[in-house]
Amino acid sequence: MATGHHLEMPLQVAVIGAGRMGGHHARIYASLPEAQLVGIVDTDISRAQALAQQYNCPAYGSIEALLAACPDLQAASISTPTIYHRALAETLLSRNIDTLIEKPLAPTVADAQALVALARSRQCVLQVGHSERFNPVVRALSKHRLEPRFIEVHRISPMRFRSVDIGVVLDLMIHDIDIVHHLVRSPVASIAAVGVAVIGRHEDVANARIVFADGCVANITASRLAMKTERRMRLFSPDAYVSVDYQKKAGVVIHKTANQAQLDIVRQQLAAEETPDLSNLDYTELVHVDQLEIDDQEPLKLQLQSFLHAVRTRTEPAVTGEDGAFAVDVATRITQAIAQHQRNDQPPSVLGTV
């Protein structure tokens, strides 16, 4: 990767996009000693100025104006609508500016792959803003050795009319596509999906069944038309069952007991020709329950700190461009399966397949 960043001085960073997420990026960068927020960009200059005033930095109406005023810019966050990601990122990466792009990386697989290739050719850090990777629950779960065989995820919330330029798959489900991929680390063998557009032209509710090459199956449901917010995951493996609540930041891991002899006795009894009476057996003696040790650190702050660390040390980011492109590819296959299902006008119980 390109070198030359001064190791002692704060990194000069900018935020492209002064909306809700851009505001959070600006807030965190302004609070970090390792960063110097040198500009906020938005085509709505008044919105950029309002945000910049809060954090005592200049505002710009275009990325070109930012680059002209800040020739030593080292890193930037892109938090604009997805359709602008590729053009903005190409402008930054072509100038060797390390870039963090809010999820999804790009609206299409071709755009995502082009950005990955450009970042690689320019030896730039390209990190994708899958902030759920930094959720305390996910970080706690990563400390456990798991071999997932089945994963079930529900991510539902009321319609907030944000990210309406994309459907619920690229808006919400993509978080779980990334997390599942992070846990499974196996190629996708097949995808089946169903979804429906209720408010706009993009799907607002979707369900996908992803089968991986290693045999693991993930069933993911996302909705932005629910009456409540819920973000839960259940994971089954040969040695453990996991249940986590992202929203409540809580989780439990249930392992098989270390008392293998006791397990073997129970298995022998169950395998016997005559069904044994095990009604007095205490099930809890066969398992070990671990509450996940979860902290209260802000995921987005951890994400930006990890990005700055990758920039400073010239190391691979926690969520790579390749990770982001994988998520876009799977999300695209899901939306294609949904479209195929709708074209076939099949009954709801039949899923479209890609």
Language model features by range: what are they?
Residues 25, 55-116:
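Beta-loop-alpha module in the N-terminal Rossmann-like domain of NAD(P)-dependent dehydrogenases
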Residues 177-260, 293-297, 301-314, 350-354:
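Contiguous beta-strand/loop segments that form the cofactor/metal-binding neighborhood of enzyme cores
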Residues 129-136, 159-190, 203-204, 324:
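Mid-domain beta-loop-alpha active-site segment that forms a flexible
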Residues 35-39, 74-76, 125-126:
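Short active-site oxyanion
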